[in-house]
């Protein structure tokens, strides 16, 4: 974390596409994010690069489960009804989408071994993350920049 005169430096000129304002750059390093310990373990916790995965009342998906820093479920955007260029407000403004993502996230936590039963999901509300991917597409980010999108996490 950048520090100036003993104080955290929050301002700066580092820009991250998709973030609306520049700030101080915080560099991080992952030594071995899938290392055993705490919540570490296999990078692919199911043992597969791609799983055929059933989420009750939602559907069957080709999914990749990765535990490398932040446990994440990768899904094809089209398989969940998106194009892959949706902005945050599009998802956050849709209560049905949020409920669907929460169910996917909860069942993903079980699939990844992060919890033992779906009933434990409420106690683990932030992971795994869901990333939906699509073919690269050009779109305008929330900050107004033209981007060629490869992946969007939620």
Task: Write out the residue ranges for each language-model feature.
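Active-site proximal loop and beta-alpha junction motif in alpha/beta enzyme cores
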Residues: 1-154
């Amino acid at each position: 974390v950048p520090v100036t005169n003993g104080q955290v430096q929050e301002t700066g000129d580092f820009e991250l596409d998709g973030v609306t304002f520049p700030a101080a750059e915080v560099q991080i390093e992952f030594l071995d994010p899938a290392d055993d310990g705490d919540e570490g373990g296999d990078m692919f916790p199911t043992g597969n690069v791609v799983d055929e995965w059933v989420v009750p009342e939602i559907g069957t998906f080709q999914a990749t489960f990765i535990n490398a820093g932040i446990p994440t479920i990768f899904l094809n955007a089209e398989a969940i009804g998106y194009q892959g260029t949706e902005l945050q407000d599009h998802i956050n403004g849709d209560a049905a989408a949020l409920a669907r993502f929460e169910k996917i996230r909860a069942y993903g936590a079980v699939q990844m071994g992060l919890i033992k039963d779906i009933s434990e999901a409420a106690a683990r509300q932030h992971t795994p993350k869901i990333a939906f991917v699509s073919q690269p597409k050009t779109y305008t980010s929330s900050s107004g920049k033209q981007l060629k999108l490869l992946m969007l996490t939620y």
